[in-house]
């Protein structure tokens, strides 16, 4: 399964635009045949990295991320009375929203909904190896921009892993280590536009 440039950039745009949104998520149907669900994350790294509790307790997933996934999915069902199964659902998220999006995808995938895909930007590791095995066949574009430090958390020594290979986005202003600045979702979106301009093809 592949995702077009149009779908991926719309997903990342929604990840950017969800921050000032009143809800914890943003839904877009601008791309024909697709529904894009963007989950709110955070642009602030220092507050939550220092306080993050590195616990895998339920279904091999970080408990906090899993709670966010359950809450967001419940809100979505109430707000939209379900989703059109004929449209591909692309779940997207930046930062903590990326981890939440991954676990929403896990919930839907395990329930038998295979008409989904995942786009994440600067996501921390969401869980352990059992989670990775469960969704290994899910289409997931996992973007990391420059020196972004968030994808390196929680530590792999605590049993945390990423579920899919990385797609690296170049930092055009990479004159120093700027792992916090590189986490900004606006920088992710701009770098993705340049990435696709250089590729001229869909992933």
Question: What are these model-predicted stretches?
Answer:
Residues 1-92, 96-203:
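Non-catalytic, mobile gating and regulatory segments of ester bond hydrolases
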